[in-house]
Curated annotation (Swiss-Prot):
Keywords: Cytoplasm, Disease variant, Epilepsy, GTPase activation, Intellectual disability, Lysosome, Membrane, Phosphoprotein, Ubl conjugation. It comes from the Eukaryota. The DEP domain mediates the interaction with KLHL22. Residues 494-508, 1154-1165 have a biased composition (Low complexity). It comes from Homo sapiens. Changing H214D: In FFEVF1; uncertain significance. Changing S1073R: In FFEVF1; inhibits slightly DEPDC5 signaling; does not change kinase activity of mTORC1; does not change association with the GATOR complex; does not change RRAGA/RRAGC and RRAGB/RRAGC heterodimer formation. This is GATOR1 complex protein DEPDC5.
Length: 1603
């Protein structure tokens, strides 16, 4: 009921009355309004659209007769405050939207997140510009559509489609520099100018208007053909990238990267760079002045490397889950070509490209600078490689509907638009003319529409075929020829089935074949030759044209179409014009189906079977009145003229993504009569009716309004039960008269692949062509064996997670028509309940199952939830497509290089969807982060790598403020004070990772008082691990020997002792463990390694002395692998003596506590100060417990026992509070004794034997566990329980050991030491070498190595702030050791996380790191990986910076280190280079090699302290042996070897993960990396003699210290 009563409109600001609601109403004024109602608000006489809002809150104290609306909303809808408005409640059904566009920026939103956001919007109102927020995801409503018109507001129901558009996508712009770029267009502009000054300039302006922040890569590409007879004519070093095409010509493909992965506010400056490159381009690609090369010619655009270029970008897009960035979503490739959109391509590559593009949901836009031709474009002409001497005429064509193409019209063209130089077709001829033409009436009865085009006939090929055959009775020959072929190919029926034999004798005007062929391009010829084209009437019994997208199966063709009489006469002679697909469907019967035919000149009507691929992008566009998708950049000529005339080409109106469903098509469903249970074959009308096909010349190519005539093709098709796309042009204009403008919308805000699709195969198809496999999961069944605090997911949550995971992998939810309950007599498809009866989410009704169908390519999943059981049914094609693997070599000039091309290779391949391990993933989701299932590579989990770097703000700031030189980082070693500060900061950072809240922090990590000055941890020396490299010059690096000497000296003098022991003796410095078994990285079941681990660590003292007679770690580790050898002795291990002390300590413990509480702190203070190294352990323990002066114990935390402390803090406390303990080493010894006496124990309750210095949790043993000893008697139970607890403890808490650096007693740079510092593989082996010399406990060292693995794993609950209702978890891998001179790595791997929530957590870490004196940045994984590797990027090549050592050589000497032993040369060189890197602020980046699926390259890698740049030494760390050393180059081609064999230098790579979000004063500004590069290069080539100066200063140090 509409009321005409008026109310006053008042406005409020957001947050008014404590709520954010846009609408506030008073229930007293509006008694009939209840919560959730939709209210329409409008001024009585207003032309603006009325506002719809949902009532979310009622407020009684609002004044009478008013309604209050949010200020921002009133501004959008131009509502005037304090004026009268009507207020009416409306029925949601009347105002439901069909399509909502949400735009977002600077975020990564996964498809699962999109779906959950969409569900949260159901049953709400949307209006333009509305801000939407969900779980930290922010988006804004763009366009809203109802049917085919845009509206301002509306209601979102379950059926509303939501499309996401991203203004920060990954965009690749390829500019095809084929020879036409140097030609002039018809308006006198160079095509290059049109592309750059015209199109690109317009594009960049539009980006700016729309406030886009895309991450852009711009590449110029072209193909150079060489006039050569054999490969030998090319220089040897370049032969790797020379290829031969199908005609035997030699060519080379060039890619010049202009910018890579850049984000800029202002892109127009780039145009200048591109213009400069245009001038040099012919020289770059060897068209001019190429010495040693044969003559080169640029290819035309048609013969260029178009598909290869977009495949290179797909190789990057394929890996969107690796190096996952949190501030961009979406992928787009734009190719700018000077041609008209015709390309000669390789069939296999075309099919592969299509599969990759569609399955991965990537948008590809082709922007043509040429004039739009009169045939369908884009058009692929396929090389027929198969048989070069094939007599077949005509070429194979394919119209790739999966490419969104645009024609760019420059501004100068718009003025000249009164004349269009595209030849118009002749008008309709009067009937009298027809008679003259002698048209036989039998060819078409008058009642039939004159103009229905033959669906695809290549006229010229047909002519040539006709005129080629000798003899009078051509028609007969044709038939026999055809039927032979028919038998051969046993083919699919083609829709243009012309029954040639029934045609009257053909006119005998002959044309030479050449002329016929040439006519294909001369459009007027169609008119002239019309009289020879007597097209006989085809039978109406036709089948589908294999669409360029469609994966249609030949099998149904045969089953449905086997009526032999029609079949036999139906195949159309030898038109070899066709779609590419069907060639590949090789059937078990051994016949190869014939390809269906495509005629590029008649694209406007091809009945296409609707397939899932063709439908994949359909839900991105609004729908026109007859159900077709509206693509606004396709204008018919009239509207184009109007638009241009009125100057209103509003770019926002152009819509439509990828799917170029031949002009204006997709009349998706004409008939609503189809029942879900309809299993009929899909053309069910009889084959007897005939359909006449009018002649092109008579009919003007389909200029008829759509007829209602039953016999016309369209209607007969549309009545079929299976939806067929009649790819028809708008009624009055034939397809190729449709002028295609530029799709600016998809070029500025590309759409993400829609979440839904409506293609569903019929039941018959599913049964015939698919194999079915299913499995059940009971998510809630295994609650009992979870640890009590583990979160449990309900079946409903797991079910939704399953849907999310499928969406994340690119599946789409199939939306099915509602309400038609199948007739009980007909079994419903696959015995399912009415599918989807309530749209996206069917809620659990009693005895009803929740069910979703999802599809991707030709795989379908049905996921059902019933009675807490989830059933997954997968339908896989019986005859999967074979997709080729294509090896491609090319020449690449990376962005940082001006003109040097390197030869690279990659593989293009497509992963088979069928092979994804869904069963494993579903189990992983059910296990919700417990360690039964770990992430495996094939799941394609998302991953990001972070490094924690010491922040060097002052030095970085000096450089950004204009300091001339950048080698100011290694000036002076860090002061002790700074090191303590950093260690303290690190402890606080890890505390943050562990989410531990602490009380006041005044004195936790004690700063060193004056008395302690001597104690040192050295400055940034590299830790010597497997990856390690030697200590940088000028720093105190050390060898075992020097440390020993130092230790002896230290007995004499305490001051010295403090300095050295720390570096040497400490018993529990952490290890970079080399032990094989110990790294629990990526093992299939973390449980196993937990258990194994324990046996190693737990082995009791009594046994161990016998067990490890002073072996080094490596040997000890191996026997452990079977896990049994140690298990034997665990039973009897506890010797009685121990249990005795254990008991005593408890009693003392009790007294200790009471005394602490009673006595006042001053007396305690005395106790503390009088502690000495000779005090008993229990006294020290008492002092530790003291509330004010003791170690600060951790407050009670969930999952940690009481009385816990952090090992680093207790060590520092001992050094500060106990006399006689001057060094960490001594403190660690005392703690080690306490551990052995069982006064303290590891917080997991584990009987660890080693005290580890670092961020490790230990607890003071109290009397609360008196039975501990007794419990441990039975070996087995104790053992397994312990392992489980321990493993779960390890997966909950971050624990990191500190590596103590070794000290060198001299100032001599490491590379000039008389003997090189030893480089033990790990701390532990270093440790054992010391202890051996002192007869110490080397088993402890071995155990230590096992206890501190290289890398550890934690399962993180990501949702710290409870943003979502789902369980969010990820696996976090981190370094087991922390060293002040190496980056600390943290890697996140996830499947089930809302990206926005994860980003929020990591941003928290980032802020925490900053406050602790560090910098946490996302970094590339494998910055130096080859293009063909998992982590490689085909357009990224590293930069080599040579180090000019020749200027340092003495006269007559061959090597820099001639005065030393030859076998140390390379190690010294390595140390020398490291010293230089160190001066420039590089620290070691010990990446975990296990993450790569290639052998660890073992090349030392460094990262700059700002996180902006990586360095790599181009040779491995192994000792240099006589054989040649090869730099990591892209091919094994010799050119690399020539210039880098003995060439010393560095590889340089930018960290492209460092976006604006992460920048701070510690990372420097955007120009920082370039400045660093320039200065570093200058230093290395010895500009201003800087390198020599550095070298001499090092030599002086060496001579000064010489005796």
């Amino acid at each position: 009921m509409r009321t005409t009563k008026v109310y006053k409109l008042v406005i409020h600001k957001k947050g008014f009355g404590g709520s954010d609601d846009e609408l506030v109403v008073n229930p007293k004024v509006f008694p009939h309004i209840k919560l959730g109602d939709i209210v329409e608000i409008a001024h009585p006489n207003d032309e603006y659209s009325p506002l719809l809002l949902q009532v979310k809150s009622l407020k009684e104290d609002l004044q009478k007769e008013t309604i209050s609306v949010d200020q921002t909303v009133t501004q959008v809808f131009r509502l005037r405050p304090y004026q009268d408005v009507y207020v009416n409640v409306v029925d949601p059904k009347d105002v439901t939207l069909d399509l909502v566009e949400l735009t977002f920026k600077d975020q990564y939103i996964g498809r699962g997140d999109m779906w959950r956001l969409k569900k949260s919007l159901v049953s709400t109102c949307a209006y333009i510009t509305q801000k939407v927020e969900f779980a930290g995801i922010r988006a804004q409503a763009g366009e809203l559509w109802v049917k085919n018109e845009k509206v301002m507001c509306g209601y979102i129901s379950e059926d509303t489609r939501v499309v996401f558009r991203s203004t920060s996508a990954m965009v690749y712009i390829f500019i095809q520099m084929s020879c036409e770029m140097w030609d002039f267009d018809i308006y006198g502009d160079l095509y290059f100018e049109k592309a750059v000054n015209g199109f690109l300039a317009d594009l960049f302006t539009k980006w700016k208007e729309k406030n886009c922040s895309h991450e852009v890569t711009v590449v110029l590409f072209s193909r150079t053909f060489y006039d050569a007879k054999s490969v030998d004519e090319f220089p040897e070093i370049n032969r790797a990238s020379i290829r031969q095409d199908h005609k035997g010509r030699f060519y080379e493909d060039f890619y010049k990267v202009v910018v890579q992965n850049e984000r800029r506010e202002e892109w127009t400056s780039l145009l200048v760079t591109i213009k400069k490159l245009f001038i040099q381009y012919p020289v770059l690609v060897r068209l001019e002045q190429a010495e040693g090369f044969p003559q080169g010619d640029n290819s035309t655009s048609a013969q260029g490397n178009y598909l290869e270029a977009i495949n290179l970008s797909f190789n990057v897009f394929d890996k969107h889950y690796i190096n996952r960035n949190f501030d961009r979503t979406g992928q787009m490739s734009v190719v700018i070509t000077p041609g008209v959109g015709v390309f000669e391509v390789d069939r296999l590559l075309m099919i592969l490209t299509k599969q990759r593009m569609i399955d991965n949901g990537i948008g590809v836009d082709l922007v043509c600078m040429g004039e739009q031709p009169l045939h369908a474009v884009p058009l692929f002409k396929l090389h027929n490689r198969s048989a070069p001497r094939d007599s077949r005429l005509g070429d194979d064509y394919n119209i790739p509907h999966w490419i969104n193409h645009s024609f760019y019209t420059s501004k100068s063209q718009l003025f000249c638009n009164s004349f269009t130089p595209r030849i118009k077709l002749a008008g309709k001829k009067p009937a009298s003319e027809k008679a003259k033409n002698g048209r036989d009436t039998s060819l078409g009865s008058p009642k039939e529409s004159e103009n229905a085009l033959p669906i695809q006939v290549d006229y010229d090929a047909y002519d040539a075929q006709v005129f080629r055959l000798p003899g009078p009775s051509r028609a007969q020959c044709l038939t026999t020829c055809r039927s032979v072929r028919e038998r051969e190919s046993h083919s699919r029926k083609s829709a243009s089935s012309c029954d040639v034999s029934s045609s009257p004798s053909l006119p005998s005007r002959t044309l030479p074949t050449e002329e016929v062929r040439s006519q294909a391009s001369d459009d007027s010829s169609l008119g002239k030759s019309a009289n020879i084209l007597m097209i006989p009437h085809p039978h109406l019994h036709q089948y589908e044209v294999s669409s360029s997208l469609g994966y249609t199966s030949t099998r149904d063709v045969l089953e449905n179409m086997m009526e032999p009489p029609q079949r036999d006469s139906s195949a159309p002679g030898r038109f070899h014009v066709g779609s590419a697909e069907s060639m590949l469907h090789v059937r078990p019967g051994g016949y190869t189906p014939q390809r269906a035919l495509i005629n590029p000149f008649a694209p406007s009507r091809m009945p296409m079977k609707l397939t899932s691929n063709r439908r994949r992008w359909m839900h991105t566009f609004p729908v026109g009145p007859s159900g077709e998708a509206i693509q606004i950049h396709h204008q018919t000529r009239q509207n184009m003229a109007e638009l241009q005339g009125s100057g209103q080409r509003d770019p926002t109106h152009s819509s439509a993504e990828l799917l170029e469903l031949a002009y204006h098509e997709a009349a998706g469903r004409h008939s609503n009569s189809r029942q879900p249970g309809d299993g009929m074959s899909f053309l069910n009308f009889s084959g007897t009716e005939e359909l006449s096909v009018g002649l092109l010349s008579n009919s003007g190519a389909g200029m008829n309004p759509r007829t209602q005539n039953k016999d016309s093709l369209e209607d007969s098709v549309s009545t079929s039960p299976d939806p067929i796309l009649t790819l028809s042009a708008p009624p009055v204009v034939p397809g190729f008269c449709c002028t295609v403008g530029v799709d600016w919308k998809s070029l500025t805000t590309p759409a993400c692949l829609p979440l839904t699709t409506d293609y569903f195969p019929d039941r018959q198809g599913l049964q015939n062509d698919y194999t079915e496999g299913c499995y059940d999961l009971l998510p809630e069944a295994d609650i009992d064996r979870r640890d009590e605090d583990g979160v449990q997911m309900t079946a409903q949550q797991v079910f939704e997670e399953f849907i999310c995971q499928r969406l994340m992998q690119g599946y789409q939810i199939i939306v099915q028509p509602k309400t038609q309950k199948p007739n009980p007599a007909v079994p419903p498809p696959l015995s399912s309940s009415p599918l989807y009866s309530r749209g996206l989410v069917s809620r659990n009704r009693p005895e009803e199952e929740d069910q979703y169908w999802l599809s991707m390519g030709r795989t379908f999943h049905k996921v059902t939830l019933k009675d807490k059981m989830i059933t997954v049914t997968r339908y896989l094609p019986k005859y999967p497509y074979e997709s080729a693997q294509i090896h491609y070599t090319y020449s690449l000039c990376p962005s940082h290089s001006d003109s040097e091309f390197v030869s690279c290779w990659v593989e293009f391949s497509h992963e088979r969807l069928e092979e994804y391990k869904w069963n494993y993933l579903d189990q992983y989701i059910c296990s919700a982060g417990s360690e039964d299932f770990s992430l495996i590579e094939s799941l394609k989990f998302w991953r990001t790598r972070f490094l924690l770097l010491p922040a060097c703000v002052t030095a970085t700031k000096r450089i950004t403020e204009g300091e001339a030189h950048c080698d100011i980082y290694g000036d002076r070693p860090r002061a002790d004070e700074d090191e303590w500060q950093l260690l303290d900061g690190f402890v606080r950072f890890v505390e943050g990772l562990n989410r531990i809240r602490r009380r006041h922090r005044s004195d936790r990590m004690m700063r060193k008082g004056t008395a302690m000055k001597g104690l040192q941890m050295t400055g940034p020396i590299s830790t010597h691990s497997l990856e390690s490299t030697a200590p940088p010059v000028g720093k105190k690096g050390t060898s075992a020997l020097s440390a020993l000497l130092e230790m002896e000296a230290s007995q004499k003098c305490l001051g010295e002792q403090q300095a050295a022991v720390h570096g040497g003796k400490s018993s529990a410095q952490s290890a970079e463990s080399s032990s094989v078994a110990m790294t629990p990285t990526y093992m299939d079941s973390p449980r196993k390694d937990g258990a194994f681990f324990m046996e190693f660590v737990r082995s009791p003292r009594t046994a161990s002395s016998a067990f490890y007679p002073q072996v080094s770690v490596d040997q000890t580790a191996t026997p452990m692998l079977d896990g049994t050898s140690l298990g034997i002795c665990t039973g009897q291990s506890m010797d009685r003596g121990n249990s005795q002390t254990f008991g005593n300590s408890q009693n003392i413990g009790e007294q200790g506590y009471s005394s602490t509480n009673s006595s006042d702190s001053s007396s305690q203070q005395l106790v503390a100060s009088s502690l000495t190294s000779s005090s008993t352990l229990t006294e020290i323990l008492e002092a530790m417990k003291h509330p004010s002066t003791g170690v600060q114990l951790l407050s009670e935390q969930k999952g940690l026992s009481p009385y816990c402390f952090i090992s680093a803090e207790v060590v520092h406390w001992l050094v500060n509070h106990v006399e006689g303990i001057q060094t960490q080493a001594m403190a660690i010894d005392i703690m080690q004794k306490m551990l052995e006496e069982q006064l303290i124990t590891h917080a997991s309750g584990e009987a660890w034997r080693t005290f580890i210095y670092g961020f490790y949790f230990y607890k003071i043993v109290t009397d609360k566990e008196p039975d501990r000893v007794a419990m441990q008697q039975p070996a087995t139970t104790w053992h397994t329980a312990g392992v489980d607890d321990f493993a779960s403890f390890q997966r909950k808490w971050f624990e990191v050991a500190f590596v103590a650096e070794e000290l060198v007693h001299s100032e001599i740079p490491a590379f000039l030491l008389p003997w090189l510092p030893s480089r033990p593989a790990s701390y532990a082996s270093r440790h054992s070498s010391f202890s051996r010399s002192f007869g110490g406990r080397s088993q402890a060292a071995a155990l230590l190595a096992a206890t501190v693995p290289e890398q550890r794993t934690v399962t993180l609950d990501v949702d710290v702030n409870n943003r979502t209702d789902r369980l969010e978890w990820c696996s976090c891998y981190y370094h087991g050791n922390f060293s002040l001179n190496a980056a600390f790595e943290i890697k996140l791997h996830w499947m089930a996380v809302t990206a926005a929530v994860l980003f929020e957590m990591v941003q928290g870490w980032h802020r925490k790191a900053t406050s602790c004196g560090f910098l946490l940045v996302p970094v590339l994984e494998g910055p130096f990986a080859l293009p063909s590797y998992l982590y490689g990027d085909p357009l990224r090549a590293q930069l080599f910076i040579p180090l000019n050592i020749s200027c340092l050589l003495k006269e007559g000497s061959e090597h820099l280190f001639d005065s030393f032993e030859p076998e140390t040369y390379w190690d010294r060189m390595h140390l020398f280079q490291e010293a230089i890197a160190h001066r420039f602020g590089f620290v070691q980046d010990k990446y975990s090699a296990s993450a790569f699926n290639f052998p660890a390259e073992n090349k030392p890698q460094y990262i700059h302290v700002t996180g902006t740049v990586f360095l790599q030494l181009p040779y491995s760390k192994r000792k240099f042996s006589g054989q040649q050393r090869r730099r990591r180059n892209s091919t094994s081609s010799t050119n690399q070897n020539m210039f880098c064999e003995e060439r010393v230098g560095y590889n340089w790579a930018y960290n492209t993960m460092l976006t604006k979000t992460w920048r701070s004063s510690a990372t420097g500004d955007e120009k920082f990396a370039d400045r660093l590069l320039k200065d570093f290069t200058d230093f290395c080539i010895n500009r201003d003699n800087r390198l020599v100066t550095f070298w001499t200063s090092c030599l002086e140090k060496m001579h000064a210290s010489a005796p």
